[in-house]
Every structure is written in C-alpha cells, then in structure tokens.
Design a protein with these regions (language model features):
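Structural recognition of the conserved hydrophobic beta-strand(s) that form the central parallel beta-sheet
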Residues: 22-28, 125-127, 143-144
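C-terminal or mid-to-C-terminal helical accessory/interaction module adjacent to the motor/catalytic core
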Residues: 179, 191-230
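Non-catalytic terminal extensions of ATP-dependent helicases
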Residues: 211-403
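Conserved segment of the helicase C-terminal RecA-like domain
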Residues: 30-31, 137, 141-144, 148-151, ...
Length: 403
C-alpha cells in the first residue's frame, strides 16, 4: 500500500511517524526493502519475521462454468459494484444464499454480510477486490469472474499483487487443507501471476506535511511547488490533482476568509470526488464555514426523517450514507460535536436498510437505451440492436458536422 498513488502517503506517514515502542508492519515480500529503508531513516531497528502459507493454493485445471460449477464456500470476484449485484441476483434466483461485499458498502453492512457467511446463513460470497484486505472468511475457492479491472484511468489486466492478494483468501487454515482458484476467463494467465515472483517496490508515496503551510504562498501554489521540487530518491509524490482543485475553489471564492490551516483541513476531508452531489455538498460546507455559520446551518443537512429513508432504493441509500460520512468528517475536522448522535443514528438506520436491499433486492443488467435485459457479462451498456443504432446516429452526426 505504501506505493499506492492515492492512499500510499497514509502508510508512509504511519511508518515514519507513529509514536510507539513496538510497531508491527505486515507486508508482501516486495515491500520489505522499501520499509526497511524507512525504518533506517528514522534511526530505528527492526526484526524481520517471515511467515509461510500453511495451506496449499491450487489453480484448478478446468474452466469454470457459471452458474453450473458453483459450490458452497465459493467466493466470486468481480470488479464493479454493478456486476457484483447482478451476479448475486442471478445466484439468488438459482436458490443460493449469498453474501455481498464491495468497497463502497458501509463498514457495518460489510460486517453484517461477513457474519451471515460465518454463521452459515449464506454459503456463497460475491465480492469486489475489497475482499483482499481486512476480511478473513472460510472460503474454499476464489473464482475470478473477470480478469480485467478499471483502475480509474483505463481498463487493464490484473497485476500480480492483486491476483496474489485476492486468491490468497482461499483455503483458510484450520478449515481447509488447501485452497482453490479458478477463473471464467484467462485462467492460465491468472495462474502465472499467482505463482510468479514479485518485483521489488522501490519508492513509497508521500504528501505535503502540515508544516509546509508556513511557506509564503497559497496552499494550491505550495502543492504545485511540492510536486516539482520533492526529492525523488525513494519517494514518489501522492496524486494532488484533486486537492489542488479543491484548494483553488476555496482561494478563488473565499480568499483570506479561510486561513491556510483550516483550508488544509477542508481539502483533506475524504469523499468520493467523482460524485457531483458530494462535491457540491463539500462546496456548501466550505461556503458556510467561510460565512462563519458551520454549526447553525448543519441541521439542514441532517434533518432527514426515518420515513423518508425507508422508501429509498439501494443507490440512494448508499449515496445518503456517503453524505453522512462526509458530514461526519467535516464535523471532526472542525471539532463540531453537536450532531454526532444524530449522524450516528442516521448511519445505523441507513445501514439496516442497505442490508435489507442486498438481501431482498433484484439487480439485472439492462440496455441503457431500450431497457432490454442483458446477460450479466454483456460487454457493452447497450444491446446489439441499440449499439448499431447508436453507431449509425454518431456517423450521421459526424457527417452533418462536416457539411
């Protein structure tokens, strides 16, 4: 994780700055070199303890057919929330009890879904790669339902670290003597990655520390300077693109009404910056901070009745939970405690309803143009007929444009 361009800085800061007599750092073999470098930079000592996997991990020698080859203890891995929900729906239609796990689920919901699998209430897990971190389940077999994922920039083949991390969930010690791995596509390539040798991580990610605020420039300018001047020997710079945009919003609209220290806190509030609704909410919170009314105007955002939430579908419930997360982080950043209990109650209610939707809801792949139901693994967002119509319309548009 120290090499992750978005979140790696948090692990780097923890290793360099945690105040404790003994620190346990767990990692894959390819991170050992860079972590030892960080420890030596601090003048500290370390003990290198290596663990071996106790259960064998076997790539099956036959192709996996969905849903015919499903067995109890299987975990099906997909790389989008939409595909996870569709697979879960299809399995429930076949009579299977299913737990659903993906990254944007509230922690309490993930915990409830894990508990259902642990106590035998469900026998199959359908999940994203969120299962690869912090989840310990009695999974007998991992099935990759696809071999490529969208990483925020492009759709690419899984890398070695991802395959090893996900596949390693199969074969829990004490329950299974060995774990199994299979795939709906590219089984041989996944097997090669699973048993391949890691490349060493040569740099870790850092972001500007708070002390850079003393520089006589605006925060957005400081971040741009940081990107150009930071020594690159064993460090790489965190992706600051979005935070620079947030800082520029504050500086252009509010100028000196928000000091740099507060601005730094505001731009580091975590939220999904791809969501326009959450971005607008963040801007509203910044605006009311600049107006000096963060406490009195917060009630507007948490004044949601349980009856209104009851009628919501899964998409809206997840969006509302993200909104509550953003409000909670904002209150923490500004030390506002008046709404802690209200936000906690709302998050609990939303989580309960999300569990209900995951258990009882049905989710299918549909053509975004005509609404026709598509196969779960259909490559495009439209049926073949609508795809051809859409392609023809685009050709006509281009022809008209050049007349």
């Amino acid at each position: 994780m120290v090499a992750d361009s978005d979140r790696g800085w948090a692990w780097t800061e923890a290793i360099l700055g945690v105040n404790a007599d003994v620190v346990h750092v767990c990692m894959s073999p390819n991170a050992i070199h860079i972590v030892k470098m960080l420890i030596k930079m601090c003048g500290d000592t370390y003990t290198d303890i290596r663990h071996k996997r106790n259960s064998r991990l076997i790539v099956e020698d036959h192709d996996f057919i969905f849903p015919d080859d499903i067995r109890d203890g299987d975990a099906l891995v997909a790389f989008s929330r939409r595909k996870v929900l569709m697979l879960a729906t299809l399995l429930k239609k076949e009579g299977y009890k299913v737990s659903v796990i993906y990254g944007s689920l509230p922690y309490s919901v993930r915990k409830a879904e894990v508990a259902r699998f642990l106590n035998g209430e469900s026998r199959i897990v359908v999940c994203t790669d969120a299962i690869g971190m912090g989840v310990n389940l009695p999974i007998r077999r991992i099935i990759f339902t696809e071999s490529k994922k969208f990483d925020g920039k492009s759709k690419r083949f899984l890398n070695m670290s991802e395959v090893k991390q996900i596949a390693g969930r199969a074969g829990r010690k004490g329950m299974y003597d060995q774990g199994y791995v299979n795939s709906i596509e590219d089984r041989d390539q996944i097997g090669e990655l699973l048993h391949g040798r890691y490349e060493q991580i040569t740099s870790c990610v850092i972001q500007p520390p708070r002390k850079v605020l003393d520089m006589p420039y605006s925060l957005s300018e400081i971040f741009k300077i940081w990107l150009k001047t930071i020594e690159k020997k064993c460090f790489s710079v965190a992706d600051l693109k979005n935070r620079i945009k947030l800082a520029e919003y504050i500086e252009k609209k509010h100028g000196e009404k928000i000091n740099k220290d507060l601005e730094y806190s505001l731009i580091n509030i975590p939220f999904d910056e791809n969501s326009e609704k959450l971005k607008y909410l963040w801007q509203d919170l910044v605006d009311m901070t600049a107006d000096g009314e963060p406490v009195s105007r917060m009630w507007y955002y948490v004044d949601t009745e349980s009856e209104d939430i009851e009628a919501m579908k899964l998409d809206d419930l997840e969006q509302l939970y993200k909104k509550m997360d953003l409000l909670n982080s904002y209150c923490n950043a500004l030390n506002i405690s008046e709404y802690d209990e209200r936000i906690r109650i709302l998050k609990e209610k939303i989580s309960e309803l999300i569990v209900r939707e995951l258990t009882n809801g049905e989710f299918f792949n549909k053509c975004k143009r005509c609404g026709k139901r598509l196969e779960w693994n259909h490559r495009f967002g439209m049926c073949e007929k609508c795809y051809e119509i859409n392609k023809l319309e685009r050709m006509r548009y281009k022809a008209d444009k050049w007349r």
